[in-house]
Amino acid sequence: MMKHHYLFLKLAMLALAMQLTANTEVQAQDVQVQTMHEELENGITQTLWIENGARRIFGELFTPQQPRKESSIAIIAHGFNGTHEYGRHYHETLGRLGYSCYALDFPCGSVRSRSDSNTLNMSIIDEVSDLKAVVRHFRSQGFRHVVVIGESQGGLVSALTAADLKQDVSQLVLVYPALCIPDNWRKHYPRLEDIRDVTELWGVKMGRRFFEEIHDMKPLDIIGQYRGPVLIVQGDKDQVVSMDDSRRAQQLYAPGTRLHVIPGAAHGFRPDELKQEMEQLETFLKKE
């Protein structure tokens, strides 16, 4: 029990460190769009709020100076206790390829979320709903090619989202996806009655609902419903996410799914390892 608790603690810690750098009617907020940073060489960044029913989702939209002929966007889903800032790693590569990029803050997904920082209401189910809302929003705005990129817990959310939105997600990228989260917590809390009202991980307080909703969830029985192109990137020294899960996911997805293993990389990439990820991403996107 403690072993699995420790693994998830590591997931929380590493995701936090890396972040330094339903069918719902979806509509755009009467959005206040403003430049957040200095104009980049290959594009600009702006704030964009998207609504999912009563939920308001904050995000940062990067628009390249030279967009692709076919309107294309990558949507970035951060990991546990992360934020939209994770998406900035992708601006250079995506801008060079002519892709827009939208990185969101999952409501209740982080103590630093600009959408909603009340992590007691964190929920995988809600994050899937929010990501689906974002995908549908950009589809409604005329983007014909939508790529979803998810890291760690965001990888789990992205995989579940793509399984539901088979026709709307053009390509899927999973970066050390934490498909193990339900199984880890099921072992820590074998019975529903074992779940505490509040579970705290590295200062992040999570409510019962998070654990109740995933108690019987089996992602590997679901994610293969998505049959589009998939890229999985993971390090062979990852002590949080089992390489076996990623290998099995590769087999569950359509033929041609690529699992790129970065030698020596753990759960969270150093700059040289991040460069490898971007090289793989560029090759993957150029195929379509």
Predicted regions and their residues:
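The serine-hydrolase catalytic nucleophile loop
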Residues: F80-E92
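Catalytic histidine-centered segment of alpha/beta-hydrolase-like enzymes
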Residues: A265-K275
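Hydrolase active-site cap/lid region
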Residues: L165-G207
